Structures are given as structure tokens and as C-alpha cells.
Swiss-Prot record:
Keywords: Amidation, Neuropeptide, Secreted. Belongs to the pyrokinin family. Myoactive. Its main location: secreted. This is Pyrokinin-5. GO terms for biological process: neuropeptide signaling pathway.
Amino acid sequence: GGETGNDAKAMWFGPRL
């Protein structure tokens, strides 16, 4: 998930990162 396509970061920082 997230704009970066990085689910590992999206789960912590949210879809904006």
C-alpha cells in the first residue's frame, strides 16, 4: 500500500508515504 508501493512503510507512515 501507499504511493511508494511499499506496504512495509505504508503500515507505519500511511498511504501518503
